């Protein structure tokens, strides 16, 4: 019997241990192959797909993420496989197998698995690539459907890339074998574990880091997040690592000392197993909780943004079709009757119309950070105009005294209150006249379109506006015209037609909502679709890590279960013990990852000024369902494997 035959028999003998790793590799290869096939598909070009280069860039970024994650996962798995088989390697060495022969045998085993994974992954990729192309055709509104094609470059990149990856990481891991002595290999599984210890200072540090990271995340707006994202990431990672290596030990030692509950039922066995294996599990729990947080945060944030996209568009572009005439005495951008006739011919229904004038003013505003001032611009309008649009949009109306005013900003992200409530502010007209108002609370509502980047409206009482407008010639005022359309999402064609009717020198003064909404929606939907693929890969890999960890301890668990049965522990109690131990590994990282993601969701809600609680619950619930199913299947396989060894 040669080494290749032994390698094949070893794979079949350790099939339960290898299956999760193999399937994870197959999925990674298949996703890589499908994405590569799309990127290099002859039909994927700018002529056929609007924004085709952007799509390719997104998919290429996803490929980099997959490769980096595969490096991490394969390295971890190879290390776990070698650790689990130390005793077997020690016995083979004792019976005369040289370290060179041992390394060859392991090399053959891993090479067979990697070649099979590449072949199966490409086969699965070919099988599902047509479905992927159909989905992408629908999502990207492709002019000519993307046909099924065998892309040679995808084959070459997938086979060459993963062969190099598997072989390089395998050779690096084999270097560990020659450093181990026979006695260390044989006794590796027999080394007694001492009660784990912890540092009080590191325990406090973990809680402080997590608390600080959560606080920074929960209180951040869009401007803050630009500066806080890396500190939050570092604090949460440090806090999570020391939470599992230190704080969890402190918590379980506290449970260990509670004798009234420690000796109740099977708690003595479950808690003892958990605390004595905690140091072994700490790194894996840290990694899987971080992976869970990444999956929930990435998928959740994109899904929440997608769900809130329509409201964001209606906020930033207040009317479906709108424009500003910088000389209110005439129409240079477009005549209202021209727009109305075009909309009528396209069977677009107008729900309300805005035709209002405003007076440009300037004021001194604080920079977002620091104590410096800058000159800013605003458009002074009447509360009558504001309330007209507010009623149509379902916003509360506001009534002002003659000396009162407030600032309205259409953008809710990157917004800092311009003035404090009750503050007296000065505004300057072009004529040199200075206006003074007591400022009411700032509103961030989508009322009228921004004018040349001027997003602030200064809303004053009707009486005050009428008095001021009498002294300002109409040609020095600005006119804002806008139309809100029924089912505006379906008005892309007429919106683009109106855009083409605007003189080139006035294109920046004209705004439509439907075309930009469809482009952004398409981009976010693509990100969500790609993100789901990558998230599923992360989820499978995370589950594989848990599965692998349990099967590396299966021999010790089998010995323990046999001892428990001999002292009278029932089958029901043994099933309960195993279920709790597996549940701990599956759901503690889930809880930690969910908490991390929850604060990321809170930050996004603050940034968008929107309640995204329902979307967060949906994402977390879906993930929990898949995690629970994975747990049930793994528990069944693991219990059966343990009991078969008795």
From Swiss-Prot:
Its main location: membrane. It is a multi-pass membrane protein. It comes from the Bacteria. The chain crosses the membrane at residues 20-40, 54-74, 115-135, 154-174, 203-223, 232-252, 285-305, 523-543, 582-602, 613-633. GO terms for cellular component: plasma membrane. It holds the Pfam family FtsX. Keywords: Cell membrane, Membrane, Transmembrane, Transmembrane helix, Transport. The keyword Membrane applies. One of its GO terms (biological process) is transmembrane transport. It is found in: Cell membrane. InterPro entries: ABC-4_Integral_Memb_Prot, ABC3_permease_C, ABC_permease_BceB-typ. The keyword Transmembrane applies. Belongs to the ABC-4 integral membrane protein family. This is Uncharacterized ABC transporter permease YvcS. It comes from Bacillus subtilis (strain 168).
